[in-house]
Amino acid sequence: MATRNPPPQDYESDDDSYEVLDLTEYARRHQWWNRVFGHSSGPMVEKYSVATQIVMGGVTGWCAGFLFQKVGKLAATAVGGGFLLLQIASHSGYVQIDWKRVEKDVNKAKRQIKKRANKAAPEINNLIEEATEFIKQNIVISSGFVGGFLLGLAS
């Protein structure tokens, strides 16, 4: 038994309208934590007392500062040791540095960085605005984090 297919419908019509969405404005209006955690998350720390917020920020800041200090010491030791070995090798005659070539390469790198910095400025400004807004909305826990971070660096 043969079935009869209906004629194809014309889906394009004059009354179809589409809304144009500007993604840059959308991104500015919607905070990054809403995109990651959903709209119901919000700043959860506002539910806690000021003392609890300061303690939470202080403890997380201290942990971050302590880890930053340990990793920073290791990185500084590695970089400093590398420079020391390079200096010894240069003084002993194993390595000769072509300073004109180094200067040329550094100037080339500076030009490339300036070009890239001019292109990335809007994205960086948007990120800075979001971070500033986050800090303003959560000033208590942010100040606790900064204090804890500095204590973690000192310990």
Swiss-Prot record:
Name of one Pfam family that matches: FUN14
GO aspect biological process, one term: mitochondrial fusion
Membrane topology note: Multi-pass membrane protein
Keywords, ordered alphabetically: Autophagy, Isopeptide bond, Membrane, Mitochondrion, Mitochondrion outer membrane, Phosphoprotein, Transmembrane, Transmembrane helix, Ubl conjugation
Tissue expression profile of the protein: Widely expressed.
Segments crossing the lipid bilayer: 48-68, 75-95, 134-154
Effect of S17A: Almost complete loss of interaction with MAP1 LC3 family proteins
Compartments, as annotated in UniProt: Mitochondrion outer membrane
Domain notes: The YXXL motif mediates the interaction with MAP1 LC3 family proteins MAP1LC3A, MAP1LC3B and GABARAP.
Subunit-level organization: Interacts (via YXXL motif) with MAP1 LC3 family proteins MAP1LC3A, MAP1LC3B and GABARAP. Interacts with DNM1L/DPR1. Interacts with GPX4.
Known function: Integral mitochondrial outer-membrane protein that mediates the formation of mitochondria-associated endoplasmic reticulum membranes (MAMs). In turn, mediates angiogenesis and neoangiogenesis through interference with intracellular Ca(2+) communication and regulation of the vascular endothelial growth factor receptor KDR/VEGFR2 expression at both mRNA and protein levels. Also acts as an activator of hypoxia-induced mitophagy, an important mechanism for mitochondrial quality and homeostasis, by interacting with and recruiting LC3 protein family to mitochondria.
Protein name: FUN14 domain-containing protein 1
Organism per entry: Homo sapiens (Human)
Biological classification of the source: Eukaryota, Metazoa, Chordata, Craniata, Vertebrata
Gene behind this protein: FUNDC1
